[in-house]
Structure formats: C-alpha cells, structure tokens
C-alpha cells in the first residue's frame, strides 16, 4: 500500500486552504494555482520539494509601521486600536518587531517569536534562516527579534499590523535591517513615521536613505505613506510651518520630491495650545490626514487580494522569462567550457603521447608502427581491451574536466545566492548538473510540454482572478445596482455592523488569523 501521509508543506497548504475557505474564500482557487506553479518550480529544481512559492506572501492584508526612535509609532497604534497594547513613551521598552493580530478569545496576549517563525500564515515564516545568514548564531534567538501580540480590537479583523522598533540605520544591526527589508517587501501598506520634535533630518541621512531613498524607486512605491508625527510640538514655534518645511527639504534631499506628506499628533497627549485659532488649524489638518491614513488602512484587504494574484502572475512570468533562460545560459556556458577543456586536455595528452612514441622509435615516417602493434590488431581480445582502456581514459579525463567546470560554476552561483533569484538559480543548477546528465543538452531539466502547459494555465488563471476581483469591486457599464461585494466590505469596516446578534456567538464571525486556540493548525 502506498504511503499517503502528506508532506509538511502539503499539510501547511491544506491548513491554509481551510483558513481561506472561512476567511477569504475568493483566494481559494489562487492557492490551487500556486500548487500548479510549485510543480514547475520543483521539476526544474529551483525550489526544494519541501518548500512552496505560496509561503513567500502572507495571505492576510498587512500594514507595517516603521519610523525613527520616539516617532510615536506605538502611540499611533494604540490610538488606532483603541487599546493600550504597545508600550509608549520617550523610553519605550518594545525593542522587537511586533506582529499584532485579532484575538480569538477576546483577550490580549503576548506570544514568543517562535509562533511567527513556524507559522506560514504570518510574514515572518522561517525568518530565523534569514537572520542566521547575516548573523551567525542569531537564528536560534528569534525570540529576541520578534513577538506576536493578540488584541480583540475589531479594526484588526481581516488584517495584520506590524510595529517595528525605533529605526536608526547608522547603529542598526544587519539582522534588523534584513527583517525591515523583509517587512517592506511583504506589506500592503507601509506607514513611515518621523518625529516633528527633531527637525534636523540632515543629521540622519543614512536612516532617510533606507526609509525613503530605497523605497521611492520601487514599483510599489504608492504603498508608502510618510507621516510627520507629534506635529503639535511645533505650535509654540515662531514659525511652525518652517519645521514642516525643514523636514520636507530633508526628505527632498533623500529623493522624496512628490507624494503626500501627512501631519498627525495624539490629541490626548498634545501640548496645550495658547491660541484657539492655532489649535483649530492644527486639529483640522490632523483630522483630515488621519482620515486619509485610516481609510488607506481599511482598503488593504482589497489591495491584498490583487497583490496575491499579481504575485502569482509575476512568479509565473519570472520562471518562464528569467529563471529558465538563465538556467539555459549557465548550462550552455558549462557545455562550452567542458568542450574547450576536453579539447585542450586531450590535445596536450595527444602531443605528449606523440612525443614519447617518437622518442621510442615507434613511427615509420607518418605511420605508427611499433613492433607489438600488428599482434594487438590481430588478436580481437587484446584489441578490445586496448579500446576499452582508451575509452576509459578519455571518459575519466572528461569526467575530471566536467567536475572542475561544474564545481567552479556552482561555487560562483552560491556566492550570488544572497537574493531569492540567485538562490533559485543555484538550486536549479545543482539539479541540472547531476553527474548522469549530459552537458550536451542545454535546456533546463524538467522543462517540457507539461510544464509549459502548467505555466500557461497559471497565467490564464491569474487573468481570470483579476477579472473576478474587478467584477466584485467595479462596474464599467455604470450600473447603479449596489455591488454586494463592496457593500460587504463596507459593512466589515463598520464596527457596529460587526457586532454579532445576541443569539449568535461572536467567534463565528470572520477575522484575520486568530492564533489563540488554533495551535493545531
């Protein structure tokens, strides 16, 4: 009987499908397309059989809050959630990356970083490996970098919120910068906060470079919102607008010359305003900017669905148009080097053999005529043995040349495997250069008609998924009939609409991944 026990990655994918069935059913078919894409990635060797491309994206909307020390990130999060979840103040003690999600039992809890590192539903799945790559020995200390907090706030239903420790690129550990880049890549919305009480951005150019310069050139730069927080502290300045102007100049020097620049502060902790007109002006600006920020945060659920589908299409095209051609080029390079190596080596061996036989007097003009030659040719056994020896010598020399070329190629690829793409190529080339594979075939192993059909099917599915999402949230014909999907989305973001009937338990209502009580998944 065949063993039908699912592999760990299959079990994780099955668990993901079960959660999506209850919480985001429109993405169920997308998971199946990721499974098809995994088959191609496994067959060409770019991805180990124990991994899935689906784990490279969190399946729940994600909002991250980055910023400098004392920028008010924790206070902003507490006000947004309506709960004192994060420690705030000038000497905040939360020095870890904190993932915040909805609580299943209505209680606020703090869970260790291991809860994130081992769960593919969250954005830090297996992040310990990335930490270990840049800081040897630190991968086992994942709890020193990460923590998971749960909160019963209704605003967390359907999304994940991430709070980061105060950012300072000058003093930041490489491992912390790696995690920050990981967050930025996966987030649907990134709030970048600065402290208006420190109006000298010129003194923090490295930090601005990492938080601004490296983000505005990204294809998804529209997901970044730059916020000047605690702006109320400038109310007593002779010219408060100059503080804002100083920050705008500093950000412009870092490359941010366009885009929205928000100004906020905490009303409860605001400094007293001596002039009512100044207070009213600050509050009006603050309320308008906060409304825009919270509206963008409410929209991430829609953006996440498009982003997951977009990544599926991007991965399929990247495999077909980047990974596979790169594998073919590397194999062609190996073929060329091996043939040249064989030619040079056999040429040198041939020249040495001719020289030795000439010195031994085995040549009669241009005819090879040693005294034992006719006897070997006349005996089929001896001639067969001699032919076998020659073939063996030539084969062994070819093996040594091939081994040297492959080893040097893999060493070079491993040195460039610091990126996801580089790792894929290194993995694939190990599979494509197995000793039993000939170097004469430069096409990628595992890439055939079936894999081509799978890629084409995934691309068709991606287009269909986008059209399905468009049908849910748009009406190109101008039909005035309310779209049920949009009505559902708006009701989900209305706290009053989320309250369950008195005779229906609250836990039946849909939410983001709620970890308490779900350890088995």
Regions inferred by a protein language model and the residue ranges of each:
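Conserved nucleotide-binding/hydrolysis micro-motifs of P-loop NTPases
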Residues: 105-107, 166-168, 197-200, 231-234, ...
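Charged, low-complexity cytosol-facing tails and large interhelical loops of integral membrane proteins
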Residues: 168, 179, 423-521
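Conserved C-terminal guanine-recognition region of P-loop GTPase G domains, centered on the G4
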Residues: 125-159, 172-254
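Conserved G1/Walker A P-loop phosphate-binding module
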Residues: 2-141
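Cytosolic-side membrane-insertion boundary helix
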Residues: 307-349
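Canonical P-loop GTPase G-domain recognition
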Residues: 223, 231-304
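Transmembrane alpha-helical hairpins and terminal membrane-anchor modules
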Residues: 336-423
């Amino acid at each position: 009987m065949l063993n039908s026990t699912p592999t760990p990655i299959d079990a994780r994918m099955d668990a993901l499908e079960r959660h999506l069935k209850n919480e985001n059913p429109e993405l169920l078919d997308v998971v199946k397309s990721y499974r098809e894409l995994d088959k191609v990635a496994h067959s060409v060797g770019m991805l180990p059989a124990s991994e899935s491309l689906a784990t490279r994206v969190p399946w729940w909307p994600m909002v991250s809050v980055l910023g400098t020390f004392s920028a008010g990130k924790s206070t902003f999060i507490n006000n947004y959630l309506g709960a004192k979840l994060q420690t705030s103040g000038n000497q905040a003690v939360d020095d870890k990356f904190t993932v915040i999600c909805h609580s299943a039992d209505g209680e606020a809890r703090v869970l260790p970083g291991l809860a994130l590192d081992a769960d593919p539903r969250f954005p830090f799945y297996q992040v310990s490996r990335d930490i270990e790559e840049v800081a040897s020995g630190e991968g086992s200390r994942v709890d020193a970098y990460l923590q998971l907090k749960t909160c019963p706030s209704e605003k967390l239903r359907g999304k994940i919120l991430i709070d980061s420790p105060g950012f300072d690129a000058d003093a930041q550990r490489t491992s912390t910068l790696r995690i920050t880049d990981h967050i930025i890549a996966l987030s649907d919305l990134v709030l970048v906060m600065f402290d208006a009480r420190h109006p000298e951005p010129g003194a923090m150019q490295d930090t601005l470079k990492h938080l601004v310069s490296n983000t505005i050139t990204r294809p998804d730069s529209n997901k970044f919102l730059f916020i000047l927080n605690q702006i109320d502290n400038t109310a007593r300045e002779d010219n408060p607008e100059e503080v804002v102007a100083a920050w705008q100049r500093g950000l412009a020097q870092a490359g941010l010359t366009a885009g929205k620049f928000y100004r906020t502060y905490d009303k409860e902790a605001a400094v007293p305003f001596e002039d009512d007109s100044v207070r009213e002006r600050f509050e009006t600006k603050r309320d308008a900017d906060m409304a825009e920020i919270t509206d963008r945060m409410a929209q991430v659920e829609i953006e996440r669905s498009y982003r997951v589908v977009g990544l599926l299409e991007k991965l399929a095209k990247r495999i077909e148009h980047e990974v596979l051609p790169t594998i073919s080029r590397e194999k062609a390079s190996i073929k060329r080097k091996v043939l040249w190596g064989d030619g040079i080596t056999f040429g040198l061996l041939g020249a040495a053999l001719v020289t030795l036989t000439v010195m031994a007097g085995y040549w009669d003009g241009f005819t090879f005529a040693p005294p034992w030659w006719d006897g070997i040719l006349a005996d089929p056994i001896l001639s067969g043995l001699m032919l076998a020896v020659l073939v063996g010598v030539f084969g062994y020399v070819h093996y040594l040349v091939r081994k040297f070329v492959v080893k040097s190629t893999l060493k070079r690829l491993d040195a460039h495997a610091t990126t996801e793409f580089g790792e894929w190529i290194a993995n694939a080339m190990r599979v494509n250069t197995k000793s039993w594979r000939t170097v004469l075939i430069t096409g990628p192993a595992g890439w055939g008609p079936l894999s081509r059909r799978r890629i084409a099917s995934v691309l068709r599915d991606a287009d269909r998924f986008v059209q399905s999402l468009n049908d849910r949230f748009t009406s190109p014909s101008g039909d005035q009939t309310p779209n049920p999907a949009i009505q559902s989305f708006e009701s989900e973001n209305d706290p009053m609409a989320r309250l369950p009937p008195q005779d229906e338990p609250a836990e039946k209502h849909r939410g983001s991944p709620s970890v308490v009580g779900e350890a088995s998944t």
